[in-house]
């Protein structure tokens, strides 16, 4: 009688001799090179905005899509610098920056659209783009003096430099005002000592906006915070080994270390002791622009799931024809479209000068949680294929989860919204 081990060995050998599953390989190739159409007439975009999406999407399919899965698996974007310069040539790195510094002079809606399309191809590269274009460049645009803008913006906008923002610390995440990084005045410099943690683009950044305590006795503590522009290579500034993250792999993140790091007083961004105003006003726009990330991830889930449901067969028909699968398609699509309308409308309002803290928190709260659910639904639709790494569904889920944590957790966003309503009744 054949033993169980012998039978298992026969089955394994037989399986290994089979040719690759054509439906699986074919679908992966198909999804790499084509996207579902996005109806921007429904989304309320003008012709220039529609063209922007199409141009960016076409560029990304050629220059980023073929690498997206490898970037995630290796946790490394090998040609990051080259790609960044290509984004600079495309004109999207300084999309909200004035033309005089090499920017495109467009609005936050356009920034969201680019963030969405990059995240549609790679959530990790989208996150790095958001940190560069909004957290770094836009902060210098909004708060820098003319000398600072002329010095830093052109190279950040061209892609020669990579930018970052450093706010969080190991024990100061949501409670960011409790930061411990200290900046002590000595002559015409400030000497920084301490560290920052979870810093997106940290290992790669040439220019960083860094928040530090210049007055540890200030009451309230927020009045003692100042923003600085720090350059890679400044003596006393170093980066630790990049972190091995659950998702957003290839968007390099690390700890920043400051050991008697001398930063010129001329590099104060905004005004001494007014860093909290730079921080909080920038945080609203950070949350808005980063909300484009979950939109892109949700669209990517649909890009892969909808065609699969109309190719895979079970019980003699395409599984997309089963009512339960139709329900999932409807749920995923309506979540995406509801999020899009909210994000786009808040972006339009900000472009018109009406930017509210509760809605900037609201757009990323809702879109982030919807993205996680849509990614879970996508995995369920693909069944076993959704759970193997030949398909990118697991990547979408891991990337989506970051947006419930970064730029303020979902819990903090709910507090922000609730407090805004409470303030109306004081």
Swiss-Prot record:
Primary localization: mitochondrion
Gene from which the chain derives: IVD
Pathway: Amino-acid degradation; L-leucine degradation; (S)-3-hydroxy-3-methylglutaryl-CoA from 3-isovaleryl-CoA: step 1/3
GO terms, molecular function: 3-methylbutanoyl-CoA dehydrogenase activity; flavin adenine dinucleotide binding; identical protein binding
EC main group: oxidoreductase
EC number of this enzyme: 1.3.8.4, 1.3.8.1
GO annotation, biological process: branched-chain amino acid catabolic process; L-leucine catabolic process
Modified residues (N6-acetyllysine): 58, 78, 241
Alphabetical keyword list: Acetylation, FAD, Flavoprotein, Mitochondrion, Oxidoreductase, Transit peptide
Subunit annotation: Homotetramer.
Modified residues (N6-succinyllysine): 58, 78, 318
Transit peptide interval: 1-32
GO cellular component: mitochondrial matrix; mitochondrion
Biological function: Catalyzes the conversion of isovaleryl-CoA/3-methylbutanoyl-CoA to 3-methylbut-2-enoyl-CoA as an intermediate step in the leucine (Leu) catabolic pathway. To a lesser extent, is also able to catalyze the oxidation of other saturated short-chain acyl-CoA thioesters as pentanoyl-CoA, hexenoyl-CoA and butenoyl-CoA.
Binding site for FAD: 165-174, 198-200, 312, 323, 380-384, 409-411
InterPro entries in UniProt: Acyl-CoA_DH_CS, Acyl-CoA_Oxase/DH_mid-dom, Acyl-CoA_Oxase/DH_mid-dom_sf, AcylCo_DH-like_C, AcylCo_DH/oxidase_C, AcylCoA_DH/ox_N, AcylCoA_DH/ox_N_sf, AcylCoA_DH/oxidase_NM_dom_sf
Cofactor(s) this protein cannot do without: FAD
Record-given protein name: Isovaleryl-CoA dehydrogenase, mitochondrial
Gene3D superfamilies tied to this protein: Acyl-CoA dehydrogenase/oxidase, N-terminal domain (1.10.540.10), Butyryl-CoA Dehydrogenase, subunit A, domain 2 (2.40.110.10), Butyryl-CoA Dehydrogenase, subunit A, domain 3 (1.20.140.10)
Active site: 286 (proton acceptor)
PROSITE patterns referenced in this protein's UniProt entry, alphabetically: ACYL_COA_DH_1, ACYL_COA_DH_2
Pfam families (alphabetical): Acyl-CoA_dh_1 (PF00441), Acyl-CoA_dh_M (PF02770), Acyl-CoA_dh_N (PF02771)
Catalytic activity: 3-methylbutanoyl-CoA + oxidized [electron-transfer flavoprotein] + H(+) = 3-methylbut-2-enoyl-CoA + reduced [electron-transfer flavoprotein]; pentanoyl-CoA + oxidized [electron-transfer flavoprotein] + H(+) = (2E)-pentenoyl-CoA + reduced [electron-transfer flavoprotein]; hexanoyl-CoA + oxidized [electron-transfer flavoprotein] + H(+) = (2E)-hexenoyl-CoA + reduced [electron-transfer flavoprotein]; butanoyl-CoA + oxidized [electron-transfer flavoprotein] + H(+) = (2E)-butenoyl-CoA + reduced [electron-transfer flavoprotein]
Location(s) in or outside the cell: Mitochondrion matrix
Family according to the record: Belongs to the acyl-CoA dehydrogenase family.
Annotated positions binding substrate: 174, 222-223, 277, 284-287, 407-408
């Amino acid at each position: 009688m054949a033993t169980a081990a012998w039978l298992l060995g026969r089955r394994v050998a037989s399986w290994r001799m089979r040719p690759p599953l054509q439906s699986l390989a074919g679908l992966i190739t198909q999804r790499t090179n084509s996207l579902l159409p996005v109806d921007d007439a429904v989304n309320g975009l003008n012709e220039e905005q529609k063209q922007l999406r199409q141009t960016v999407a076409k560029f990304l399919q050629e220059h980023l899509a073929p690498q997206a899965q490898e970037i995630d698996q290796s946790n490394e974007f090998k040609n990051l610098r080259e790609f960044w310069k290509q984004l600079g040539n495309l004109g999207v790195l300084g999309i909200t920056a004035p033309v005089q510094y090499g920017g495109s002079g467009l609005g936050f809606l356009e920034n969201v659209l680019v963030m969405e399309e990059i995240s549609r191809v790679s959530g990790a590269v989208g996150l790095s783009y958001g940190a560069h274009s909004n957290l770094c460049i836009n902060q210098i645009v909004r708060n820098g003096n003319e000398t600072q803008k002329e010095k830093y913006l052109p190279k950040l906008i061209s892609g020669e430099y990579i930018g970052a923002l450093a706010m969080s610390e190991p024990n100061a995440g949501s409670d960011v005002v409790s930061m411990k990084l200290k900046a002590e005045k000595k002559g015409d410099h400030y000497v920084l000592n301490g560290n920052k943690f979870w810093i997106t683009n940290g290992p790669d950044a040439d220019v960083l906006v860094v928040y530090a305590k210049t007055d540890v006795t200030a009451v309230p503590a927020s009045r003692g915070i100042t923003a600085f522009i720090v350059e890679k290579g400044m003596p006393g500034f170093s980066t630790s080994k990049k972190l091995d993250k659950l998702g957003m792999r290839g968007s390099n993140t690390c700890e920043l270390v400051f050991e008697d790091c001398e930063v010129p007083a001329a590099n104060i961004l905004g005004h001494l002791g007014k860093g909290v105003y730079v921080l909080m006003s920038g945080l609203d726009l950070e949350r808005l622009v980063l909300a484009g990330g979950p939109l892109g991830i949700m669209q990517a889930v649909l890009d892969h799931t909808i065609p699969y449901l109309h190719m895979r067969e079970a019980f003699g028909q395409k599984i997309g024809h089963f009512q339960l699968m139709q329900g999932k398609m409807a749920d995923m699509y309506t979540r995406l479209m509801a999020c899009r309308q909210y994000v786009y409308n808040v972006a339009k309002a900000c472009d018109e000068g009406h930017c509210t803290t509760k809605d900037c928190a609201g757009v990323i709260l809702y879109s982030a949680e919807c993205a996680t659910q849509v990614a879970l639904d996508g995995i369920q639709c693909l069944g076993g294929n959704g759970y193997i790494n030949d398909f990118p569904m697991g990547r979408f889920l891991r990337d989506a989860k970051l947006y419930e944590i970064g730029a303020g957790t979902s819990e903090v966003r709910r507090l922000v919204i609730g407090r805004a309503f409470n303030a109306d009744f004081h």
